[in-house]
Amino acid sequence: AEIFYYQGTEFIDQVESLLVEQMRLFLGCPEVETRVISGQMANTAVFSAMVDYINRTDRRREPRRLSWVMNNHIIRGGHLSAQPMGALRDFVARDPITEKPAVVNFPVLKDNPYKMDVPAALALLEEYKPELIVLGKSMIIHKEPVAELRRAIKELSPESILMYDMAHVLGLIG
């Protein structure tokens, strides 16, 4: 029997079992492993799929990378996989002015460096119009303002993709 480290995630066992069963039939083999081996690998798959999607209409040129990404800074609890030195490295463009990765971090409150300053974040959304917004942290002290950001994203043109890597809080949500 599998051991799930987060409470409230037992349903994942059922989903994984169904997937394993279907993959065994599809591949015609007795054993398959359908789980990714790490958060880095999982987020690499997401970032790769996004770059593939934004380049779907032009396969002749060098693929365009994600123009701007907004995330939690690693020092403020952000996960390594969503950083330019992590899985995001090969999928984010460079800012033509600074020549650094085109990543803007969520601003935080002056009196609490681990809590997002939502009004300031909304202003940055309007300024940068990131293609991808990554929520989720390795160090969780406060809940992420998913609903507030989602409402603001609907007003952007083009609309940003909101990704919530909830691996560390899934058991609390589930």
Where are these regions (language model features)?
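Conserved PLP-enzyme active-site core in the AAT-like
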Residues: 11-14, 18-32, 37-174
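Phosphate-rich ligand and nucleic-acid binding surfaces
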Residues: 5
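N-terminal "arm"/small-domain region of PLP-dependent enzymes with the aminotransferase-like
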Residues: 1-2, 160
